[in-house]
């Protein structure tokens, strides 16, 4: 089957922002104007197409990244609407990994907010080109110019306005297009009566100022244009558009647009900008992957290249298990067998579908650049690579943040026991930031996630989707353990003689602190066969498993590097199990000698309160072991940014309301892990041993 839409006319884009900036409403308007839906759904009415889970429609927030295909001006646009709440950061992360461009939506009143910065950093990590849409221009307090400046200052982006608003708040009437030098007046709030006119005289000076900046930015992308500009020649509309496209795709320019999605103003012009400035799959750098021998290889977005696809999301569905994939090269066909290179297992594609939120359209194949979903994959998880058996390749997986909060769960009745374990397995397959473990001391099932809302929604889903009633304990902090110094030549020796065949395993290791975020790293420097090859893997496995429970308080050990340097074996008595135990013994011994410490999750907390309450808020954050990073006031509103241990933040939502008579708000997101003070460590250790 031949390709129906040329690759250069495909756009894979995401819509991302801080919570409440209007992402889902913007997506709904895009779908309405591109003909996918015939009645506009509203988030506050619980009818948005992309918010299709029950909890999303109830809460008016987007939890999972919904993928939808639509079209605009003979281009196919695949859109992912991502959540803005920090607890669902993995959804944004996995979307960024598979997108070619992003519309970053900002509220014209709130401006650049904490989650806007997080989303921006995620886009930076994957080098995703962006356009900015300053939304809600009809709101009281809307200020396009302030937000434009914040994007430049706080996000350090080369934000170039390609539109200016005509009026704001209740007087927001339309938009000036700085590239075309035309004004668009919206005669009603349905977006159906748009009049193209000359630029209003009172705006001409401002238009001239911003158009000059626009032309300078365009000229800087190309030497020939720069020469033309310096010679005083006018750049044509097409030259400006081509230059802006080049700068946007290179990441050196962020075009800035404005509008009001809710009032249907500016959405069609934004769709034009998606087509004009964001890249096709063939215009982004080829994806890099690893061959089985460890060499790096590039795969271009081309149907004729061998297949390379990344599974970026798993979803339980009444129709079966849906695996969302981005095809980077080649063609993925229904009914074909593919290799899951990450697991080295063959899988069969039984069905392929294109998504229209919770509606789906069966297709025979997905081609290079396509986003779709496959059914029939049993072993594939988020981050796995699917490829041709004859051309194996492993693509870079996703960055999975560590969970920071945990709760114990138990089924309400014995009958729910099996259902609970099935539900937890299914949910953890869908969401890599959701972890499940059984506490070896208490035998309790403990679930961990990115925040209280994250776990609340997962427990809610257990009841709704899996019909499991569960009792949930109080939230617990997900502490970690690590080491502060390196130790050398630590032995682990396991010998057992009890008649018949004995057991013998012996390893010698060096242990040192690893880079933050590396987890457990292992290197073998065995020379001369002191430990045979077949026993190196089991020894590593033993070390890795011992990291699951640290020596101080039983929390997972992270960011350590173990090097196997020596050992010995017995021709008859050595076995894989003996070396696994020896590896575990060496690891425990080494950690005890390497100055182990406990780490706690630190949260970035941003509080906004009326100025009068600023002193109270700062004093309160200090008592919570907070580190104040910045404070500012604007129009009677104080903003305080700090890093605070998660352990001190439970119940803060209630406290801040009572301290500010309900007028304070705050946002909180994970920042990093940090060593706890000695007094706190002693309390944690005593509690873990049952003495507190």
Curated annotation (Swiss-Prot):
Residues 8-282 form the tr-type G domain. InterPro entries: EFG_II, EFG_III, EFG_III/V, EFG_IV, EFG_V, EFG_V-like, EFTu-like_2, G_TR_CS. One of its GO terms (molecular function) is GTP binding. It is found in: Cytoplasm. Gene3D superfamilies: 3.30.230.10, 3.30.70.240, Elongation Factor G (Translational Gtpase), domain 3 (3.30.70.870), P-loop containing nucleotide triphosphate hydrolases (3.40.50.300), Translation factors (2.40.30.10). GTP binds at residues 17-24, 81-85, 135-138. One of its GO terms (cellular component) is cytoplasm. GO terms for biological process: ribosome disassembly. Keywords: Cytoplasm, Elongation factor, GTP-binding, Nucleotide-binding, Protein biosynthesis. Catalyzes the GTP-dependent ribosomal translocation step during translation elongation. During this step, the ribosome changes from the pre-translocational (PRE) to the post-translocational (POST) state as the newly formed A-site-bound peptidyl-tRNA and P-site-bound deacylated tRNA move to the P and E sites, respectively. Catalyzes the coordinated movement of the two tRNA molecules, the mRNA and conformational changes in the ribosome. HAMAP family: EF_G_EF_2_B (MF_00054_B). Belongs to the TRAFAC class translation factor GTPase superfamily. Classic translation factor GTPase family. EF-G/EF-2 subfamily. This is Elongation factor G. It comes from Nostoc punctiforme (strain ATCC 29133 / PCC 73102). The lineage of its organism: Bacteria, Bacillati, Cyanobacteriota, Cyanophyceae, Nostocales.
């Amino acid at each position: 089957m031949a390709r129906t839409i040329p690759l250069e006319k495909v756009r894979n884009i995401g819509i991302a922002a801080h919570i409440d900036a209007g992402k889902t409403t913007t997506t709904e308007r895009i779908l309405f104007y591109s003909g996918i839906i015939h009645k506009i759904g509203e988030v506050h009415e619980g009818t948005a197409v992309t918010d299709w889970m029950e909890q999303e429609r109830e809460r008016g927030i987007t939890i999972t990244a919904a993928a939808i295909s639509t079209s605009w001006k003979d281009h196919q646009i695949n859109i992912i609407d991502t959540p803005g709440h920090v607890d669902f950061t993995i959804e944004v992360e996995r979307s960024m990994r598979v997108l070619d461009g992003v519309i970053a939506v900002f509220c014209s009143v709130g401006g650049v907010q904490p989650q806007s910065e997080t989303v921006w950093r995620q886009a930076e990590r994957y080098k995703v080109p962006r356009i900015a849409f300053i939304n809600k221009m009809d709101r009281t307090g809307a200020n396009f110019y302030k937000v434009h400046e914040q994007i430049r200052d706080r996000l350090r982006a080369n934000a170039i306005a390609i539109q200016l608003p005509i009026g704001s708040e209740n007087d927001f009437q339309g938009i000036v297009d700085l590239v075309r030098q035309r004004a668009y007046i919206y005669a009603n709030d349905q977006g159906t009566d748009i009049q193209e006119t000359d630029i209003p005289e009172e705006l001409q000076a401002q238009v001239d100022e911003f158009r000059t900046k626009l032309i300078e930015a365009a000229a800087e992308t190309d030497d020939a244009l720069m020469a033309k500009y310096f010679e005083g020649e006018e750049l044509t509309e097409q030259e400006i558009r081509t230059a802006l496209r080049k700068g946007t795709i290179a990441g050196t320019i962020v075009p800035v647009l404005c509008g009001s999605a809710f009032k249907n103003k500016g959405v069609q012009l934004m769709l034009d900008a998606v087509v004009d400035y964001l890249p096709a799959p063939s215009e982004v750098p080829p994806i890099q992957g690893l061959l089985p021998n460890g060499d790096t290889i590039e795969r271009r977005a081309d149907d004729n290249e061998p297949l390379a696809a990344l599974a970026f999301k798993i979803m339980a569905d009444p129709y079966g298990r849906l695996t969302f994939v981005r095809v980077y090269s080649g063609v993925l066909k229904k009914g074909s067998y593919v290799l899951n290179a990450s697991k080295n297992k063959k899988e069969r594609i039984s069905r392929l579908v294109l998504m229209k939120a919770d509606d789906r359209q069966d297709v025979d194949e997905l081609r290079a650049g396509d986003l779709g979903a496959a059914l029939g994959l049993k072993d594939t998880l988020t981050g796995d690579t699917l490829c041709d058996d004859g051309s194996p390749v492993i693509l870079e997986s996703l960055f999975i943040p560590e969970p920071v909060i945990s709760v114990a769960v138990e089924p309400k009745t014995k009958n729910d026991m099996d259902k609970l374990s099935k539900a937890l397995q299914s949910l953890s397959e869908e969401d890599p930031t959701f972890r499940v473990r059984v506490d070896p001391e208490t035998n309790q099932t403990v679930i961990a996630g990115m925040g209280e809302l994250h776990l609340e929604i997962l427990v809610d889903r257990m009841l709704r989707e899996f019909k499991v009633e569960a009792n949930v304990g109080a939230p617990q902090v997900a502490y970690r353990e690590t080491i502060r110094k390196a130790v050398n030549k630590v032995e682990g020796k396991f010998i057992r003689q009890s008649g018949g065949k004995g057991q013998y395993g012996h390893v010698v290791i060096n242990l040192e602190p690893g880079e933050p975020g590396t987890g457990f790293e292992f290197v073998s420097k065995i020379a001369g066969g002191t430990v045979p090859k077949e026993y190196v893997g089991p020894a590593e496995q033993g070390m890795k498993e011992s990291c699951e429970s640290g020596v101080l308080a039983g929390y997972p050990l992270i960011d350590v590097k173990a090097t196997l340097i020596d050992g010995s074996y017995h021709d008859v008595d050595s076995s894989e199990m003996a070396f696994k135990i020896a590896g575990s013994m060496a690891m425990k011994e080494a950690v005890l000698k390497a100055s182990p410490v406990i780490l706690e999750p630190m949260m970035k907390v941003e509080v906004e309160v009326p100025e009068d309450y600023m002193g109270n808020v700062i004093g309160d954050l200090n008592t919570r072991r907070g580190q104040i990073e910045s404070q500012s006031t604007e129009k009677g509103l104080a903003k305080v940014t700090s890093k605070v241990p998660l352990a001190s933040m439970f119940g803060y939502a209630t406290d801040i309301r009572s301290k500010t008579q309900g007028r304070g708000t705050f946002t909180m997101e994970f920042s990093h892990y940090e060593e706890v003070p000695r007094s706190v460590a002693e309390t944690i250790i005593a509690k873990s041993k049952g003495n507190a």
